[in-house]
Amino acid sequence: METDEAQDMSQVSGKESPPISDVPDDADEPMPVPEDLSTTTGGQQSVKNERVLAGNIKIETQSDEENGRACEMNGEECAEDLRMLDASGDKMNGSHNGPGSKAMSGVGGIRLPNGKLKCDICGIICIGPNVLMVHNRSHTGERPFQCNQCGASFTQKGNLLRHIKLHSGEKPFKCHLCNYACRRRDALTGHLRTHSVGKPHKCGYCGRSYKQRSSLEEHKERCHNYLQTMSISSNLYSVIKEETNQSEMAEDLCKIGSERSLVLDRLASNVAKRKSSMPQKFVGEKCLSDLPYDATTNYEKENEIMQTHVIDQAINNAISYLGAESLRPLVQTPPVGSEVVPVISPMYQLHKPLGDNQTRSNHTAQDSAVENLLLLSKAKSVSSERDASPSNSCQDSTDTESNNEERSGLIYLTNHIGPHARNGISVKEESRQFDVLRAGTDNSQDAFKVISSNGEQVRVYKCEHCRVLFLDHVMYTIHMGCHGFRDPFECNMCGYHSQDRYEFSSHITRGEHRFHMS
């Protein structure tokens, strides 16, 4: 059952639900309600809320002293029970010499010069004798209206009629748009708001609209607190609140929208950098002149401390993950008669039968050329512990750009490496098993397959700008995040422009970035 039923059923034990006035459409006579106190005597004032609607209509919420205990209903439902009409305007206004005076003398009270009655016990002011009579029941404990089914008693007839609906299950107020039905007219009014299409309450800053004012106020609290945290001047809101002319309002909203777009662009840029850039330390001054707010000193210090802590931890994790050997330059070991020749790392090797008449005098020079062209300082020698790594065992969701290269298993090497001198060995033109297999492509670059020692194809990634090969997709993604969006040799962290890939790699390796004012 609903809260009304739980409340009314509790009246059997002797306690009554709040005697809030309620006159349904089928009520025999109107039941008045006490008037709100505007003045009291001797500190005996009872707190009440009153609204004069039109003429003799009164709406009020009665106190716990008069009602026993407050009902656990929402405000809209209570408003229906509080709406009372007095049919006799003469009695409401109070005639000194008419029949109303006899009724007043019967219920007691003190006549005031304005024609109203004052309770001689607590000092509450009532507009008529009926209202004062209902009020006196809170002092005497009289509850003349009793339910013949459960025995619950009430001080007003309207409350009894509302209680009887709980037993009968009657829900006369039905929604014409859905199957919703209720016992109270004000509850139906609140329900109809859920079907309304319009959202009259609009935020002047971001333009979002809401059906209820309370939702708009909650949104403004979040919006204002966010903007105050970002140190944006609060005069933008005062302009919106004080502006009444629609044309001037639209002008101000355009300014606010442009400044808000700058803030959102900066936030989006920061998110992209955090996702795709290499962990770096930021040194020097941060001159963010393009932002519509002034970054305070405290904000800069907290931001730099947080970045330093997170970046240091990320670098330590990367070193422990990759190992110290990955930071050393790769040195190719010249073959010493073995049929296994290393290509990129000891894990990925080439199988080639070597002839006795092959000369190896130029192996050292060729190995040096390969090392200079293939900057493999960031590639890690994958061990058996990395077989279960997610980046090696399954397809990564961000690996869509290199899917074609992965399916074909091709590694695009530089044009400076001759077809007969790769990785320190002389490669014949014919292809054979467990070897570097040359595949024809549409571009001018040479394409190769890297085969591991057990005959499996190796997945590799290449940066076309720096001509660097990566065996790990995470390291490849971190490296690609360092390239700028407009210019590949522009540092995505600080905007530094490099002349070529060598200067760019040197700048990234040093890891010291400084913001430059444009």
UniProtKB/Swiss-Prot annotation:
One of its GO terms (cellular component) is protein-DNA complex. SMART domains: ZnF_C2H2. Residues 1-51, 381-405 are annotated as: Disordered. GO terms for molecular function: DNA-binding transcription factor activity; RNA polymerase II cis-regulatory region sequence-specific DNA binding; transcription cis-regulatory region binding; zinc ion binding. A zinc finger (C2H2-type) spans 117-139, 145-167, 173-195, 201-224, 461-483, 489-513. Its main location: nucleus. Keywords: Activator, Developmental protein, DNA-binding, Metal-binding, Nucleus, Repeat, Transcription, Transcription regulation, Zinc, Zinc-finger. Residues 37-47 have a biased composition (Polar residues). PANTHER family: DNA-BINDING PROTEIN IKAROS, ZINC FINGER PROTEIN. Belongs to the Ikaros C2H2-type zinc-finger protein family. Binds and activates the enhancer (delta-A element) of the CD3-delta gene. Functions in the specification and the maturation of the T-lymphocyte. Also interacts with a critical control element in the TDT (terminal deoxynucleotidyltransferase) promoter as well as with the promoters for other genes expressed during early stages of B- and T-cell development. Function is isoform-specific and is modulated by dominant-negative inactive isoforms. This is DNA-binding protein Ikaros.
